[in-house]
């Protein structure tokens, strides 16, 4: 992904074709392909479109909804609340994704509240680059910081994106779990 973002398209093409072949090999073997990070997983659907890749890499919630009947049901009366801050790429490129998380957490007896936040400001490598750091911090302060600092915030807060979790840890010293960590 970084090769593509930074314009190294020739190198990206080589890596993408090699990776696509490996993914297709796993898919042909019948292995469910699940990517943890939404940004990278969705790269296989967009930036890899020219590779001829046949295998489909699912977001965790897409796969979990296929086995929803095998998940344990939550205990009535013990319902708790968890907040989700979704990766901006996930919200825009896989709009059903957030609803799928809600379905999964509901099945587990957990009320999922999706916080209405924009980009955390990290945007992959963007926020790590010195020249972009001030803008990255400004973007974070626009929605993520206030959402995390809400005075009534007592619930667990999760974030789907690795870059988002990294940004929160960098800016506020808080380690947010991925939704899979909250489920386990």
Protein language model regions, located:
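Iron-sulfur cluster-binding electron-transfer modules in prokaryotic oxidoreductases
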Residues: 1-184
